[in-house]
């Protein structure tokens, strides 16, 4: 018994000794007392049309790094990545575009100052195949020359026009002011002419029209007569605000229209609501069966604009990520050679008094008149500004311009779709056309 007590005492003393020894000789836990130093030697490699790789020296005591980007100037930076390594590959950039970057290191205590700021310009993307340019043309009143002047000025760059001419009623009767000058000039200068037919955004008109075969046939006969009489080369169907349950009837109408017009040598095209997936019961886009409609159309125009719209919350007209997602989905069901990307040439001014639309030039004038600074949102790749009017009412303005258009044209080239459709001719400015000519090598 005494033996076991002595053994137990020995083991206890030994354990205390070992624990004390480890405590005495163990390296103390270093507690961070300050944020890390700023990263150094920020450089870039592998620059291409739409990507670049950033590298910098590792920072002692840093847990990770935060990467910031701005375009086109050294201001208004956005955090684009939080990473653990000292290298970052930035993808989905626009070609031929200037970007600025800096990096910060961070740990549990805080964040470092900025690294040096660097800038670079991505490689230029030029289409290797001819891209088609369609322009929607309007003629709102006698003497309205806005679209005509744009057609005449940019004839060498425009391949097609779709004149916003006809509105149908519930029974297939069409009416509208025919832009004879636009049609005559375009036909004389090798620009294809299409007669646009709309339902005036009225789902009830479309419901009565599409759900009745007699009404559909009346409309088809009236369209055929109108394009023959006025010298059009085809038609563009722009039915919007449709009820999702009229999906099969819209498809039936396009099938009947195509089988009537196409054998006679007329083009059949249509504009469809933008969507990122097919949801047949979606309120705004459910009526459009992309896959089947493509069978009965020579061209499909994706209306990739009004992502934020009058009456809604302020925001980008067409953010680049949304536009790209729409294209990606469309390409799963529509042949790329039939696909046109809708591009906007306008802006919206939101306030508590409602929303107003402006041309690109008018938007710049609006900013100048109120001394507003135009800013750039690097997430949506869109310009915007805010101001207060004489009554003290706050306004938020988002618009499209040549710079934001560049990003869309890069997508057209990257995904090799057929081209673009501009809403609308007369709202754009010279820089807008310069972007088109440069990106499409026109």
What positions do the PLM features span?
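Sec-dependent N-terminal signal peptides of Gram-positive bacterial secreted proteins and lipoproteins
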Residues: 3-27
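Conserved, mostly hydrophobic/aromatic
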Residues: 161, 237, 300, 341, ...
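Pro/Thr/Ser/Gly-rich low-complexity, intrinsically disordered linker/stalk tracts
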Residues: 28-61, 95, 108-127
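Substrate-binding surface in catalytic domains of secreted glycosidases
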Residues: 171-173, 244-370
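Recognizes extended acidic, P/S/T-rich segments that occur
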Residues: 66-95, 108-118
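Glycan-binding loop/region signatures in secreted carbohydrate-active enzymes
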Residues: 338, 343-411, 437-442
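Glycan-recognition patch characteristic of GH18 chitinases/ENGases
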Residues: 125-222
């Amino acid at each position: 018994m005494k033996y076991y007590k002595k053994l137990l005492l020995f083991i206890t003393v030994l354990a205390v000794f070992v624990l004390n020894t480890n405590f005495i000789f163990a390296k103390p836990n270093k507690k961070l007392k300050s944020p890390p130093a700023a990263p150094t030697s920020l450089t870039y490699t592998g620059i291409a049309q739409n990507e670049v790789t950033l590298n910098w020296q590792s920072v002692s005591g840093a847990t990770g790094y935060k990467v910031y980007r701005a375009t086109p100037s050294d201001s208004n930076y956005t955090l684009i990545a939080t990473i653990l390594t000292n290298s970052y590959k930035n993808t989905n950039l626009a070609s031929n575009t200037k970007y600025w970057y800096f990096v910060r290191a961070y740990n549990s205590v805080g964040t470092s100052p900025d690294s040096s700021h660097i800038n670079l310009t991505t490689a230029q993307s030029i289409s290797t195949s001819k891209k088609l340019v369609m322009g929607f043309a309007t003629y709102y009143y006698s003497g309205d020359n806005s679209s005509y002047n744009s057609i005449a000025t940019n004839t060498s760059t425009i391949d097609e026009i779709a004149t916003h001419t006809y509105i149908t009623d519930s029974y297939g009767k069409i009416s509208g002011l025919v832009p004879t000058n636009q049609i005559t000039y375009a036909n004389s200068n090798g620009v294809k002419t299409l007669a646009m037919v709309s339902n005036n955004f009225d789902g009830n008109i479309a419901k009565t029209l599409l759900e009745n075969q007699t009404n559909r046939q009346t409309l088809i006969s009236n369209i055929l007569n109108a394009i023959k009489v006025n010298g059009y080369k085809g038609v563009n169907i722009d039915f919007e605000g449709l009820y999702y349950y009229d999906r099969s009837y819209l498809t039936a109408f396009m099938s009947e229209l195509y089988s009537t017009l196409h054998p006679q040598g007329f083009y059949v095209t249509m504009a469809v609501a933008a969507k990122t997936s097919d949801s047949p019961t979606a309120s705004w886009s459910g009526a459009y069966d992309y896959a089947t409609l493509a069978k009965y159309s020579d061209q499909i125009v994706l209306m990739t604009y009004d992502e934020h719209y009058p009456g809604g919350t302020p925001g980008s007209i067409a953010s680049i990520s949304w536009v790209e997602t729409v294209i990606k989905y469309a390409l799963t069901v529509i042949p790329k050679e039939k696909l046109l990307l809708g591009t906007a040439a306008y802006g919206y001014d939101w306030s508590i008094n409602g929303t107003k639309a402006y041309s690109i030039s008018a938007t710049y004038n609006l900013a100048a008149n109120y001394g507003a600074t135009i800013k750039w949102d690097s997430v949506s790749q869109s310009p915007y500004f805010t101001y207060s009017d004489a009554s003290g009412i706050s306004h938020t303005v988002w618009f499209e311009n040549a710079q934001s258009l560049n990003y869309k044209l890069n997508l057209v080239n990257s995904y090799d779709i057929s081209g673009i459709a501009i809403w609308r001719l007369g709202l754009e400015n010279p820089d807008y056309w310069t972007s088109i000519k440069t990106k499409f090598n026109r």
